[in-house]
């Protein structure tokens, strides 16, 4: 009898201790959770440290802290909204870690209600800003970062997301370095040869360039010894006369160092050749026709205007560095138009050290009618004519040349016409391909893989849900039964 009492006393003692320990664990967990919530602490236990900044970023930010550098980092969304979405958690954690450094002044705003701040960061409305975008400002240098560049989502054949890659750290740290260095790449509009004016004809396009983080300026080569060092590209828009020998020498020197040139060569009825520009194009195996392209199929041109024609985007090889120039536009099923254009072709006998590709071509019902030039030429028929193309020279430090047969589609008048938007986007893509404004810090992207269970039908799904619901209940019942049995034993 005494032994049984002792046994019951021992069971009660152990049960009491167990209950006390359980209560203590719950109390401690609640207190710790409250502390962590108040301090907004977090531990990154992901395999690839997806929610932590890497050594490259932290070392660079530490250096800026020591130098006393200050960057205003505007986020066009409230941090609480970013935090609440699982899809943007990596971005939220990155922004929080950036903000821990003295050099970063993180300012999150609601772009729809904070008009004063929006006016401050975009006073002339040059930037097209959307919710989720970011703007970095350091001194007089400003850079826009589209929010949709932070992630890349990969889907399966059924459109289901299978993985998500966070690209944000490399982009954001590179953008910080860009504004700290105070370097803004510039698109220079060549002048002095009757070209269309950046200030008079391309005011909206200049704003588009700013939106892509380029500056836009005019350049008269006769006033300088060489092309400026901040040149991302030289743009020549519809010159009415050839460039001089001296101008050609300066452009040659620029291209030999890996420069970028874009020629928008609208048809010109003048009875002369663009001798020096032709020579530059020939070095890239591009031959310019002295013609005006017209469409003979009435269903392929604007009613009453056979020189405003429907044309075709050319799909580039998937392993080409320039594949993205046309792929996204083609995938959207967009139909391009071009107006009053001349044509070009490649000299295939001289393309050995070059990478060349057509970007925009006509249908084979179009013709090239002779127009201008020092010599009589024949009409070009029964051929798909090239209206835009590019060439990259391996012997000139990867210098790039892009040609378009018209300069009007970018001007203030035509930019309002939706028919030319595809050509405009294509042209902007060539600029980004020639000179990417993003500074690559060499920081790897971080991936998240979504696990999923494939079930054959709804009945299987219901059965699985019942199992998931019943299993914990069964475990609890068994546990209680064991406890009761031990208590009464």
List the predicted regions and their residue ranges:
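Short, surface-exposed patches at the edges or C-terminal ends of soluble domains, predominantly
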Residues: 2-489
């Amino acid at each position: 009898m005494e032994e049984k009492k002792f046994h019951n006393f021992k069971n009660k003692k152990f049960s009491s201790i167990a209950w006390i320990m359980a209560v203590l664990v719950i109390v401690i967990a609640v207190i710790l959770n409250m502390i962590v919530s108040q301090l907004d602490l977090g531990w990154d236990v992901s395999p690839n440290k997806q929610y932590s900044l890497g050594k490259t970023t932290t070392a660079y930010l530490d250096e800026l802290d020591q130098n006393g550098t200050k960057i205003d980092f505007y986020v066009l969304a409230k941090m609480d909204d970013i935090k609440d979405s699982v899809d943007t958690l990596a971005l939220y954690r990155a922004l929080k870690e950036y903000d821990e450094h003295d050099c970063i002044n993180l300012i999150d705003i609601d772009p729809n209600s904070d008009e004063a701040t929006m006016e401050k960061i975009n006073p002339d409305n040059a930037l097209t800003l959307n919710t989720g975008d970011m703007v970095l400002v350091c001194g007089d240098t400003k850079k826009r970062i589209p929010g949709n560049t932070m992630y890349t989502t990969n889907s399966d054949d059924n459109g289901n997301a299978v993985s998500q890659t966070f690209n944000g750290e490399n982009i954001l740290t590179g953008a910080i370095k860009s504004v700290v260095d105070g370097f803004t790449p510039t698109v220079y509009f060549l002048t002095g040869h009757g070209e269309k004016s950046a200030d008079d004809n391309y005011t909206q396009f200049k704003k588009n360039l700013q939106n892509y983080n380029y500056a836009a300026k005019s350049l008269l080569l006769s006033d300088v010894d060489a092309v400026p060092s901040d040149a991302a590209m030289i743009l020549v828009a519809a010159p009415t006369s050839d460039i001089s020998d001296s101008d050609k020498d300066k452009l040659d020197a620029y291209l030999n160092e890996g420069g970028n040139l874009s020629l928008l060569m609208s048809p010109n009825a003048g009875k002369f050749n663009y001798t020096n520009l032709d020579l530059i194009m020939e070095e890239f195996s591009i031959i310019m026709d002295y013609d005006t392209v017209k469409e003979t199929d009435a269903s392929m041109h604007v009613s009453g205007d056979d020189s405003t024609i429907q044309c075709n985007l050319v799909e580039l090889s998937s392993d080409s560095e320039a594949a993205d120039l046309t792929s996204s536009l083609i995938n959207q099923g967009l139909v391009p138009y071009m107006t009053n254009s001349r044509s070009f072709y490649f000299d295939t006998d001289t393309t050995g050290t070059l990478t060349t590709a057509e970007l925009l071509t006509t249908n084979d019902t179009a013709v090239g009618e002779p127009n201008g030039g020092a010599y009589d030429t024949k009409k070009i028929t029964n051929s798909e004519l090239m209206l835009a193309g590019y060439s990259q020279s391996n012997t000139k430090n990867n210098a790039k040349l892009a040609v378009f047969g018209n300069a009007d589609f970018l001007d203030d008048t035509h930019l309002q016409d939706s028919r030319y938007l595809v050509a405009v986007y294509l042209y902007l893509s060539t600029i980004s391909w020639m000179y990417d404004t993003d500074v690559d810090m060499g920081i790897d992207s971080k991936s998240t893989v979504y696990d999923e269970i494939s079930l054959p039908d709804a009945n299987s799904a219901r059965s699985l849900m019942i199992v998931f619901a019943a299993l914990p209940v069964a475990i609890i019942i068994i546990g209680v039964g064991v406890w009761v049995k031990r208590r009464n034993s």
